């Protein structure tokens, strides 16, 4: 008795069908990836805002314990950092991080002085140390081989900020610039020295078409988060920042920007 075997053709993609599938996947990826990137950027901006709120609160707590003065107005002998405020703008500030370091008790962890959108600075990694004090040493001490100094902080410091002037710039994203044409990369500053040790800069109040405060395109897409003298944190575009500076009560608005 003969057995009859039926032959079934196994289905497979033709080359054209395969190319169509690949094209569809590419189109879907092209649609989804920008949306995912936008969602990631938004999440990073929110995280940065929360970090700056902690920084602003720490400044306020420090001031409450030091006669309503922020660290920049308190001597190092009294636990502040006034000796590290430059006498004039457009000078290097290799110890700009110190204004934040002296608030280590208030900040609790150095992770809050890093913006997740900052591609030019180095965050403190939890694998470096699990102890509170040692993590801060990684910021302070270059002799340890991992000292980050200014590279451990994403945020500027407003040297003249006062508790009694709530509109003054206290801290904020380091992609700030006093050059209205600031583009990609680290801040472009007017009359900036060549050293890569950070810079102090006058943001001013009278903005012009060629010289004026603003934000570079990095970090938060031509915008930035700013902590004000009252401890609040707001998101600013270049236009809003300039308006804020005009109403700050400070004619210089000098800030220190880490390298």
List each language-model region with its residue ranges:
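Beta-strand-loop-alpha-helix segment that lines the small-molecule cofactor/substrate pocket
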Residues: 37-46
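Exposed loop/turn and edge beta-strand positions of beta-sandwich/beta-sheet ligand-binding modules
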Residues: 9, 18, 42
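Short, well-structured segments within or immediately adjacent to enzyme catalytic domains
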Residues: 49-259
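Generic anion/oxyanion-binding catalytic loop in active/binding sites
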Residues: 25, 44, 220
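N-terminal leader/signal peptides at the extreme start of proteins
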Residues: 1-15
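Active-site helix adjacent to the Tyr-X3-Lys
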Residues: 30, 42, 50-53
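Alpha-helical hydrophobic helix detector
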Residues: 19-38
């Amino acid at each position: 008795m003969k057995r009859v075997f039926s032959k079934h053709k196994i289905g497979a993609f033709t080359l054209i069908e395969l190319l169509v599938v690949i094209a569809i996947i590419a189109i879907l990826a092209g649609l989804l990836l920008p949306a995912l990137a936008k969602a990631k950027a938004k999440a990073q901006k929110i995280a940065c805002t929360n970090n700056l709120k902690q920084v602003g609160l720490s400044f306020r707590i420090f001031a409450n314990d030091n006669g309503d003065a922020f660290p920049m107005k308190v001597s190092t002998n009294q636990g502040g950092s006034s000796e590290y405020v430059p006498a004039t703008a457009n000078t290097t500030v290799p110890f700009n991080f110190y204004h934040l370091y002296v608030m280590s008790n208030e900040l609790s962890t150095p992770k809050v002085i890093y913006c997740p959108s900052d591609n030019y600075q180095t965050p403190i990694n939890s694998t470096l140390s699990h102890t509170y004090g040692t993590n801060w040493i990684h910021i302070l001490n270059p002799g340890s081989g991992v000292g980050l100094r200014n590279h451990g902080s994403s945020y500027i410091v407003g040297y003249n900020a006062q508790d009694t002037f709530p509109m003054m710039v206290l801290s904020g994203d380091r992609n700030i610039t006093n050059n209205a044409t600031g583009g990609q990369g680290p801040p472009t500053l007017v009359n900036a020295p060549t050293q890569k040790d950070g810079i102090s800069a006058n943001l001013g109040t009278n903005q012009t078409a060629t010289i004026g405060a603003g934000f570079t395109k990095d970090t938060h897409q031509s915008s930035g988060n700013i902590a004000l003298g009252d401890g609040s944190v707001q998101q600013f575009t270049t236009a809003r920042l300039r308006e804020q500076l005009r109403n700050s009560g400070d004619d210089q608005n000098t800030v220190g920007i880490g390298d």
